Structures are given as structure tokens and as C-alpha cells.
Amino acid sequence: MNDALADSGLVIVDKPQGMTSHDVVSKIRRTFSTKKVGHAGTLDPMATGVLVLGLERGTKFLAHMVASTKSYTATIRLGAATTTDDREGETITSASPDQLAGITETKISDAVKQFRGSIMQRPAAVSAIKIDGKRAHQRVREGEKVEIPARPVTISRYDILEIRRDAAFIDIDVEVDCSSGTYIRSLARDLGEELGVGGHLTALRRTQVGPFTLDNAVTLEKLEENPHVSLTLDQALAASYPVLSVSEKEASDLAMGKWLTPRGLKGIHAAVDPHGRAIALVKEQGKRLATIFVARPSTL
């Protein structure tokens, strides 16, 4: 039996430095000869690492991955603040060698602790956030002064790996686990402000998005040699959410958007039929077990 979703799924790319996330989407469109490609979670051109892309019906699933926890390794440079909060911006303040000499490892460690847990974070002005319909980075380039309100984020891990000193700066390698919407550039900026010497990001690598890690990621060169999805839509749903086994009849009902009798489930589950096919994402809403995303609608 032909599977209507045979070409649908996720491609996990190890994004190279220098490419925008949209550049990667364009490349994948050409590689797979399809226009139906999207990505979950923008990576700046400077950044490398895990970029999750959806193909065909997999693009519809991306909206349900946006809230995934993300992990990063990064290098924060203390001693200078920049217009973009990373190394690609212009320097706006610099600390003196004497100021940097007063920044002990204990002070750095204590400052980092202030940013663990649930915090309010002000996103970087040069970002993809829309303000009155226009991206913040566009407004900055046009000379506007942009101030984006702080928003709640959760930093579940913010660990110092190594501290390296120079007369003109202090580099700190860190590992961060955080909620979606967190800006690592903002963490660098805010750490520098907390210590009174300025700070910005000099390196960033995303190591995980939800359940998908660098072990799942493939380079663009490898994909060009052998185009293939990293996970089928069946595998993607089952990897991202707890599995709920359903009968043929229940699968048919879910495919038509019908609801099932609730079962006391908490959170979102991937409904999988007896053949191992992911039918839908479901969630209990009142007295219904309802679909929030149908992977295999009856119309396919």
C-alpha cells in the first residue's frame, strides 16, 4: 500500500556558520525538489548546530515543536558591549584592563546564578521579533531605536565550562538549557551588564531541540549526496510525544477530526494505529480526547 506521507517528515540539519536559516530552507527545497519546506526555531548566521526542518506535511508539525526546550554551547566575551549583542555588531562600550582584573571567577559564578530559573529577559533588538508588523532587525537597520519589552523565559541549566583571561577581555564557555524564545545573545549582554563590564556572544552552537540532538543532524553536503528525511512523520510524532495506541476504528475517527472518549491523559500524546502509523496529536479537553494536529487526515 502506498503511503501518502512517504515524502513527509523532518530533516535535522547541522547548520553551518554564515548561512541564515532561510538560506538552509532554500537549499533543502532545491535538494528535495519541493517548495514545502519550513523550519522550527531560527538560528543566527553566526550560529551553528541543530536546525529542524519539515518537509511536505512535516511543515504542519513544526508548529507543535516551537515550544520545545533547546540546548546550546556558547562563548560569552566580557569586556565589551555591541549593538547586536554578538561579535558581528559594532562595539559601543569597552571595559578597562583594571575593571576586568576586578572580575573574579567567584563574581562571574555568582552573576550567572542570577539568570537561572524563571526570569524576565529583554530580547536582542536585532532579532526576528515583529513590532507592528515589521521585524525588529529591519527597524534597527533603518535607524530606529528599538526597545523590546522583557518576556518570561526559563533557564533550566546555565553552567560555566571554562574561563579564559586576556588583558582586554574574559571569555566564558557555557552550556545552556532553556525554554523556547530565549536569546543566548541576551544572556551574554545581561551577564556583562550585571558585572558592569559589558558582554556579547562570540560563538553559539545549538546542540538540541526537543528530543533531537546533533547525533540526529546531517550536514548539507551529506544531504546533497543522499537526500533523505531524518525522521518520517510517524517517527517524529512518536519521538516528540508519549505514544497512545489506538484501534483501527479510533484511528479512522481521529483522521476525520472526530473526538474520542477521554482516558485521563495529561498533556499531548501521539495517537498511533495498530500498524505503527502516527494518526494525530491528541489532548484531553474537558470531556473529549480531541485532535490538535492530524498527521493523516482522511482526505489523504
Curated annotation (Swiss-Prot):
One of its GO terms (molecular function) is tRNA pseudouridine(55) synthase activity. It catalyses: uridine(55) in tRNA = pseudouridine(55) in tRNA. One of its GO terms (biological process) is tRNA pseudouridine synthesis. Coiled coil: none annotated. The keyword Metal-binding does not apply. Gene3D superfamilies: Pseudouridine synthase (3.30.2350.10), PUA domain (2.30.130.10). The active site is at 44 (nucleophile). Signal peptide: none annotated. PANTHER family: PSEUDOURIDYLATE SYNTHASE TRUB1 (PTHR13767:SF2), TRNA-PSEUDOURIDINE SYNTHASE (PTHR13767). Belongs to the pseudouridine synthase TruB family. Type 1 subfamily. This is tRNA pseudouridine synthase B. It comes from Corynebacterium diphtheriae (strain ATCC 700971 / NCTC 13129 / Biotype gravis).
